[in-house]
Amino acid sequence: MSSQDLYANAATDKPLMQVKGLIREFKAGEQTIRVLHDINLTIHQGEMVAIIGQSGSGKSTLMNILGCLDQATAGDYQVFGQSVNRLAPDELAKLRREHFGFIFQRYHLLGDISARDNVSVPAVYAGMDGQARNERAEQLLSDLGLADKVNNRPSQLSGGQQQRVSIARALMNGGDIILADEPTGALDSKSGKDVVQILKNLNAQGHTIIMVTHDPGLAAQAERVIEIKDGYIIADYKNEDYQRPVAQFSSIIDKHRKSAFGSFIDRLLESFKMSLLAMRAHKMRTLLTMLGIIIGIASVVSVVGLGKGSQEQILSNISSLGTNTITITDGYPYGDPRRQYNDDNLTPQDAQAVADQPYVLSVSPQLNSNMSVRYRNVQEAASISGVGKDYLDVSGETLAMGQGFDEQSILRRTQDIIIDSNAHKTFFPTTANPIGEVLLIGSVPGRVIGVLEPNEGGFSRSVDSPTLYMPYTTMMSRLIGSAYIESFVALIDNNISSSAAESAISNLMKSRHGTDDFRIRNSDSIRQTIESTTAAMTLLISSIAIISLIVGGIGVMNIMLVSVTERTNEIGVRMAVGARQSDIMQQFLIEAVLVCILGGLLGIGMAFAIGELINRVGGDSFKVIYSSTSIIAAFVCSTLIGVVFGFLPARNAAKLDPVEALSRD
């Protein structure tokens, strides 16, 4: 209901507030205690009413019901002609926000924010524009003699000054109806008189004032006095000398209301600010709460980085076997009975046919044998491999010195050889550069034209015995006298699916041979096995690390439950000034999420530090490689943990009863 509707009601002398047959009962174990008995009451716009009674008489309970902080057990209570008995919590909050202002005996100011911000809180929930909100808060404080205290916190103010801040807060959204609970109870006599005069001035401006007190002197200042005893109204009379003022003011909220989205953003920022203040107030507790999240996120990111680094290192070693290669080997598949009758099926022409395919980059035929090799007085058994001119490309081997084979080496069947590091150490232990030296392979001489780099990888082709390489044509004609090759290796274009290339080569070979008298091995299957194995190990270890995240999340929930308990009074104050349940839930949910996000960021930072340390210690042999996906996932995960584990505490806070919350210190 707008302020215009309010004043229309007043003009027609309709009751502003009307109570009929109101009863309020409380459960106390097995018993039911009735605090208010059949209360009937009518209050009109512009009245200044004092409800007087001793402690336990039910006056504060009645005020809580009138202020929509509590609801009656039975009977009817109407505000502006509308029954509030069946209103939802957020609808009651709307009434409090737009029409009620509360002045409490114990002030109930938020200790972590300034006087101006305390006064502004109701307007945040009402959706008032930020600049207008601050200007009005400062104006109200100035009107109440606190112009020089706008930036002071409650702890820096006297009791009288704090009560004035409380009054300014009650007026922030217009304060059509001011409910004051023992407004002078905690003040000295001078401050008490000042507060009474302020209330009378507000009544003169048209505000409806309802005071709850046990002081007859304060009650005598009101236009109307209602005496209550043991839950019954025993007297209701007017002070004859009191002059009732005429309402002459306009709405404050409607002039400066923001859009629904703008109001939501304001409330979000308010929640964010209060979350930061709460975290700052308990730095050590917040850090310890974050610790589980920090360790969990750091563990997950580090483990994924270690897994990625291990995978890359293994794949780098696999490259010594030839990257994306397919090996075609002579002979029927194992288990085929034809295998024992025919093993000579592959020819150099088969290798050339495969090399001519558009998806094949290069091919190297291969034969293998073991022979005695001699150099001067050194004789040793060695592995001899006949290879093609593209062997270095398909195998991934590199030369330490010298050169490889070329087209002429194959065509002319040259007696050139390339030796590996084992052969270098075996036959030329004191010769740094053996290029040009001649070895005797069986009875065939071979001139050294190249030396291979040592391959220390776990997937190296090298064996412990010396290995010599020569053109496959030379080996076929001069050493073994055969027209067949044992195998050939094809290097596949990286842009082509390795499995598709394997299928195409298999079909080509079957069409040439008319049968599958060959075997195919795809090096990509090794890589896939390694990748799947390291991924499985990473997932396993990550799942263990995630347990730390869950423990951290439980820690966040535990601390947030403690925070809700500690800040129950603050929750009650916010509800009293009009905060919706969603506003309260949002505030504590943001705090939980903020703790987890900060913990996540610190965890990611710790993971980078751990990775840098490992990279420095491991050198080139081992690296931690971070994945942007894992970092983003870790950040999202920490946020979700805040939402999931912060929901229960936030929900508990939102479901608190305003009266019960205000009663706690």
Curated annotation (Swiss-Prot):
Membrane topology type: Multi-pass membrane protein
Gene3D superfamilies linked to this entry: P-loop containing nucleotide triphosphate hydrolases
Transmembrane region(s): 287-307, 544-564, 588-608, 630-650
GO molecular function: ATP binding; ATP hydrolysis activity; transmembrane transporter activity
Secretion signal, residue range per the UniProt entry: none
Listed GO biological process terms: response to antibiotic
Enzyme Commission identifier(s): 7.6.2.-
Annotated ATP binding sites: G53, Q54, S55, G56, S57, G58, K59, S60
Domain ABC transporter: 17-255
Compartments reported by the entry: Cell inner membrane
GO cellular component: plasma membrane
Entry-linked CDD domains: ABC_MJ0796_LolCDE_FtsE
Complex formation: Homodimer. Part of the tripartite efflux system MacAB-TolC, which is composed of an inner membrane transporter, MacB, a periplasmic membrane fusion protein, MacA, and an outer membrane component, TolC. The complex forms a large protein conduit and can translocate molecules across both the inner and outer membranes. Interacts with MacA.
Physiological role: Part of the tripartite efflux system MacAB-TolC. MacB is a non-canonical ABC transporter that contains transmembrane domains (TMD), which form a pore in the inner membrane, and an ATP-binding domain (NBD), which is responsible for energy generation. Confers resistance against macrolides.
Family to which the UniProt record says this protein belongs: Belongs to the ABC transporter superfamily. Macrolide exporter (TC 3.A.1.122) family.
Protein name: Macrolide export ATP-binding/permease protein MacB
Source species taxonomy: Bacteria, Pseudomonadati, Pseudomonadota, Gammaproteobacteria, Moraxellales
